[in-house]
Design a protein with these regions (language model features):
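Short, surface-exposed amphipathic charged segments that create phosphate/polyanion-binding patches used
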Residues: 52-64
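Acidic/histidine-rich catalytic cores and adjacent linkers
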Residues: 2-7, 11-35, 45, 49, ...
Length: 253
């Protein structure tokens, strides 16, 4: 990439004022080598995506625990019925209510008629959204989820607060103050995934904060990349690369 970019007149390369990119070290090296006067801005959506993934990790961990708990309780219920049958006694549940010998185990349901495993599974997408975009059903589900799992609420709060930091229009200095508060909250939470994200952001903080200068993102490049991939998939492969590039320039340039 550097070799091909160097074919462009150095005066033109020097006119580039800003480049947005992700956390890729290779892309960082390319920009440093080819665009000496460009300000590097790390795309805000990439570190926000890392936070969303960290929230999902917390949710999935709780769901796995719940699935294990339900499986254990189902087995205990089966063994209890078997024990009553062997003794020739009428089975009863923990509250003393009569139970059939062939009864199936049903996990406890919450007030929205979902089990804990179900609410953990169905909360995936609401945890990726801003609360102001939730439907009434999602609002009710979120309230129950956060009440039952405060750790998920804290993880979501950290992810959402980072989104809000980059949604505000402020100076680079004020953005830095907000980020420092966010680092502190992450440290108090003590989750490894969030700690890793905060450490990576702290290491590249100046380039992340450059977003507040022009509010530039990678959105246009990501959109074009998606269109090119879709176009390539429709062709079911490329035989003549030069002709493919010619078609791309005619369609998208």
């Amino acid at each position: 990439v550097i070799k091909n970019l160097k074919k462009i007149d150095s005066l033109l390369l020097a006119q580039v004022k800003e480049v947005t990119l992700d956390f890729s070290e290779s892309m960082h090296s390319i920009v440093k080598a080819c665009f000496p006067n460009a300000m590097i801005t790390l795309d805000r959506f990439h570190h926000q995506q890392f936070c969303l993934e960290a929230v999902q990790e917390v949710r999935i961990a709780f769901r796995r625990e719940e699935m294990t708990r339900v499986a254990n309780e189902r087995e205990e219920f089966r063994l209890m019925l078997k024990s009553f049958a062997e003794k020739g006694e009428a089975p009863t549940d923990k509250e003393g209510n009569p139970v059939r010998l062939n009864a199936a185990y049903h996990p406890e349901k919450l007030e929205n008629d979902e089990t804990r495993a179900e609410i953990l599974a169905r909360s995936k997408y609401l945890l990726m959204m801003s609360p102001n975009k939730w439907t009434d059903t999602q609002k009710k589900r979120a309230a129950i989820l956060f009440r039952e799992y405060p750790e998920i609420e804290k993880a979501f709060s950290l992810s959402h607060s980072l989104r809000m930091i980059f949604s505000q229009r402020c100076s680079k200095e004020n953005g830095q103050k907000s980020l420092k508060k966010w680092y502190k909250e992450v440290g108090e939470y003590g989750n490894k995934a969030f700690n890793d994200i905060a450490a990576a952001m702290y290491d590249k903080e100046d380039e992340i904060l450059n977003y507040f200068v022009n509010r530039s993102t990678n959105a246009a490049a990501e959109s074009l990349n998606a269109k090119i991939k879709q176009f390539r998939a429709q062709l079911r492969g490329i035989i003549d690369r030069n002709f493919f590039l010619f078609r791309l320039t005619r369609i998208y340039a």
